[in-house]
């Protein structure tokens, strides 16, 4: 990232090599420069720079997103279904980038608590793909002291909105541990609820469609294994759903008292 900001930091031999190859490429494509410009404009003209997604319902709110030609990161918006209050921009990507003052700005997840009062969001401000999780009280618009570094970026709220789950990255950039963080407590007290022992596997956590269970999914490129535990459990003890079998991928969900498995 440093050499992208300042090419003079490159080793002179490497810099000369890159410049020489760039010159070869430029000369080779000299005859089609106008075609390149025309293709770029044609592709750009097919992209709707000012666009709004369809609204979807979640509990008391409608949620949707909006992109604008003048911005790069878009806005996330919500409004009470009964229309009693005006639209609320709860995450403005371009404004957040400006406020953080970072040249690089990568958004991981933006997740609203089930009580609708809190927003947990993850950002990569260095281009390292290590995401830091921040917590904001949407009633005040102010961030809480809860800051969690070196995560995969994923965030899953507990149903009582008092805590959320996240996965930490190991030294090889793999998410192999899932933690539970309780709002207002020290990060040092976060509880490890699952650890994948196989270094070739990664893990993540999500909520089933009926919100009855949390599912911990582990996988490599060709094999998966899922665990589950009740979403209202006081003590978390993940239960293996089906033992992993090489070259077999499956996922599970629950609805109206049944588990559904897709293999």
Language-model regions, residue ranges each:
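Beta-propeller folds
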Residues: 1-263
